[in-house]
UniProtKB/Swiss-Prot annotation:
Residue segments, region Disordered: 1-36
Locations listed in the record: Virion; Host nucleus
Keywords: Capsid protein, Host nucleus, Host-virus interaction, Late protein, Viral attachment to host adhesion receptor, Viral attachment to host cell, Virion, Virus entry into host cell
Highest taxon, organism lineage: Viruses
Annotated source species: Canine adenovirus serotype 1 (strain RI261) (CAdV-1)
Protein known as: Fiber protein
Length: 543
């Protein structure tokens, strides 16, 4: 006989036998609008914007401009001599400061600043005032002098002029191209003109040549223009290129604007960073001073600034996923690692076993014969006619049975006590003499060609017995059992219950089948004890 193996759970995994699967930790597992981002992909980083930046050590720091300074981890105003801050944090001038100097007419004496004043000025109740002198007597003017609105003027004829405050005769003036040299008047001529024999004449110009971008065509000169230039209404103009704008830039008419998101705004035509809300960090993120770290538990680790899954022997990272490294004799099937089995091998109870070639199987039936006598005893008295057949086909055994009472068990009432009919078999599947249906009655194998009973034992009888590994402890099946159903035409209150108990061992028996009849109180009155055909199945024993 084979050694009985301890049963394993149906979901037992021999390759990865852990109590519970670990949760997946593949990124992303964060909200990229809540202070975190991926930089580069698959790497967790803090999402910051100016004035926040990173130091050379990777810590978050604050960039400061003119007038600001970081002191002992706090942002303060950078103030110079003569200035200080009061208890309210306001910038004020120092009382005993030498930062202010005074020059005449201002003078500082202790805590008082005074103003020196001269003639024509006076201090009237703290107000500086000008003292005007008494006006002189009015003046009288005679021609050619004239007075108008407080101004004295001298009328001049066309030949007179005032030069540097002096009255003189206005000289004769000549406008270009006439010019006066000493006492002579001459005519200035430019290119293309000359004076010959006292006469103004035109000078014939030399032949004109044109270089690019000028182009002469017949009697006209034109200008060749390239990309970005054009001639419109006789004028050279620049044509704007076809410029496209990508986000965050956008064009509206002739104006180009920039779109801003959270943390940015436009103030005074300048892009500035708005104050970001205070960052809070939830587990597994931990903030320590100015550093943010990620708490990694079992199965995780931080490597090269990235969160990765810690793998042990037999596991590796392939294309960003965890894969098992398998060798010869193993394979992947339905997301599980299985052993590759050749001919003659199988897996039983999680272990690889060698199996013998399966012979061709012929169904086996053990029975009482088609019309047995009163073959079952209760308390030593034959009182039940039992028809029982056990048929092994493939791995299952089908039980067909019916029972008819005789004598004191010909009829039963609602007060009938429950009773059992037991069949006991030895290790070879042979019926023993210790049960209610025993070896003294007709019992054996049914041939294929007739309805006789072959009582000569065979090694195949064991195949009809219950499998001892499957039914290592007693197992039961309860079914309703109708009594004399044909005569009563299936009337209600004419059924009891029958329980088949498998391998409830007692004494020297190796296998047992127990038919237990109970719940007679379901009957409405006395009834003939003639059961319907009962059918059960169980797993058969190995050869």
């Amino acid at each position: 006989m084979k050694r009985t193996r301890s049963a394993l759970p149906a979901n037992f995994d021999p390759v990865y036998p852990y109590d519970a699967p670990k949760p997946s930790t593949q990124p992303p597992f964060f909200n990229d609008r809540k202070g975190l981002t991926e930089s580069s992909p698959g790497t967790l980083a803090v999402n910051i914007s100016p004035p926040l930046t990173f130091s050379n050590l990777g810590a978050i720091k604050l960039s400061t401009g003119a007038g600001l300074i970081l002191k002992e981890g706090k942002l303060e105003a950078n103030i110079g001599p003569g200035l200080t801050t009061n208890q309210e944090g306001q910038i004020t001038v120092e009382k005993d400061s030498d930062g202010l100097t005074f020059t005449s007419p201002l003078h500082k004496i202790e805590n008082t600043v005074s103003l020196s004043i001269g003639e024509g000025l006076e201090d009237e109740s703290g107000t500086l005032k000008v003292n005007f002198p008494s006006p002189p007597p009015p003046l009288l003017f005679s021609p050619p002098l004239a007075e108008a609105g407080g101004t004295v003027s001298l009328p001049l004829q066309e030949s007179m002029q005032v030069t540097e405050g002096k009255l003189g005769v206005k000289p004769t003036t000549y406008s270009p191209p006439l010019q006066k040299t000493d006492q002579q008047v001459s005519l200035r001529v430019g290119p293309g003109l000359t004076v010959l024999n006292g006469q103004l004449q035109a000078v014939q110009p030399p032949a004109t040549t044109y270089k690019e971008p000028l182009l002469e065509t017949e009697n006209s000169v034109s200008l060749k223009v390239g990309a970005g230039l054009a001639v419109q209404d006789g004028a050279l103009v620049a044509t704007p290129p076809n410029v496209t704008f990508s986000a965050p830039l956008e064009k509206n008419g002739n104006a180009v604007s920039v779109r801003v998101g959270a943390g940015l705004s436009i103030q005074g035509n300048a892009l500035v960073a708005t104050t970001s809300p205070t960052l809070t960090f939830a587990y597994p993120l931990i903030k320590n001073n100015n550093h943010i770290t990620l708490s990694a538990g079992s199965g995780l680790r931080v490597s090269g600034g990235s969160l990765t899954v810690a793998t042990g022997p037999g596991l590796s990272h392939i294309n960003g996923t965890i894969a098992a490294v398998i060798g010869a004799g193993l394979k992947f099937e339905n997301n599980a690692i299985l052993a590759k089995l050749g001919n003659g091998l199988t897996i039983r109870d999680g272990a690889i076993e060698a199996v013998a070639p399966q012979p061709s199987f012929t169904p086996v039936t053990l029975w009482t014969g088609p019309d047995p006598n009163v073959n079952t005893s209760i308390n030593g008295t034959p009182v039940i006619r039992s028809f029982i057949s056990l048929t092994r086909d493939s791995n299952l055994v089908t039980v067909n049975a019916s029972f008819t009472g005789e004598g004191s068990y010909q009829s039963v009432s609602p007060t009938q006590s429950q009773f059992s009919l037991i069949l006991e078999f030895n290790q070879f599947g042979q019926l023993m003499s210790t049960g209610n249906l025993n070896s003294t009655t007709t019992w054996g194998e049914k041939p294929w060609g007739n309805n006789t009973v072959q009582v000569q034992p065979s090694h195949t009888w064991k195949l009809c017995m219950p499998n001892r590994e499957v039914y290592s402890t007693p197992a039961a099946t309860l079914t309703s059992c109708g009594l004399n159903s044909i005569a009563h035409d299936g009337a209600p209150n004419r059924s009891i219950d029958c329980m088949l108990i498998i391998n409830k061992l007692a004494g020297a028996a190796t296998y047992t089948l127990t038919f237990r009849f109970l719940n007679f109180n379901k009957l409405s009155s006395s009834t003939v004890f003639k059961t319907d055909v009962l059918t059960f199945t169980y797993v058969g024993e190995n050869q």
